Amino acid sequence: MPSFDIVSEVKMNEVLNAVDNANRELATRFDFRGVEASFELNKEEVKLEADADFQLKQMVEILRAALLKRNIENSSMDVGDSVHSGKRFHLTVKFKQGIDKEVAKKLVKLIKDSKIKVQAAIQGDEVRVTGKKRDDLQETMALVRGAELGQPMQFQNFRD
């Protein structure tokens, strides 16, 4: 029986490349001349440091642009609040890895409400979709791509 998995993963090596590009852009921008500001990747999160809160907001936009250039959707970012310590401001950006239980339930409900002849089952942090026809699976993929679920979805293990 044909099947595929719906997952939500962010490639951390692409995030590393985006952070490097953002640091390079930060070094060349005129409005950051003479300002100590940096992006730093720690495992699953990016730490932003700057002298002022408005600079952090600009840095988040620089990071968003760098991530888009590396084909990472902005909906995978979870931007935290800025924290002031001493004369520096810090902000942490985390990335959503895997599908949460609530999002998985919404996804299964969306697929079942569409009346497409497929079955969806939650398996840990991914959703497995099985059906009798390949066309039904492709229709389900189009449905999931068009849905606004708050994080990007990828499809893996398409088996015929």
Swiss-Prot record:
<dbReference type="GO" id="GO:0005829">
    <property type="term" value="C:cytosol"/>
</dbReference>
<dbReference type="Pfam" id="PF04461">
    <property type="entry name" value="DUF520"/>
</dbReference>
<dbReference type="GO" id="GO:0000166">
    <property type="term" value="F:nucleotide binding"/>
</dbReference>
<keyword id="KW-0547">Nucleotide-binding</keyword>
<dbReference type="InterPro" id="IPR035571">
    <property type="entry name" value="UPF0234-like_C"/>
</dbReference>
<comment type="function">
    <text>Nucleotide-binding protein.</text>
</comment>
<dbReference type="InterPro" id="IPR007551">
    <property type="entry name" value="DUF520"/>
</dbReference>
<protein>
    <recommendedName>
        <fullName>Nucleotide-binding protein AHA_1129</fullName>
    </recommendedName>
</protein>
<comment type="similarity">
    <text>Belongs to the YajQ family.</text>
</comment>
<dbReference type="InterPro" id="IPR035570">
    <property type="entry name" value="UPF0234_N"/>
</dbReference>
<dbReference type="InterPro" id="IPR036183">
    <property type="entry name" value="YajQ-like_sf"/>
</dbReference>
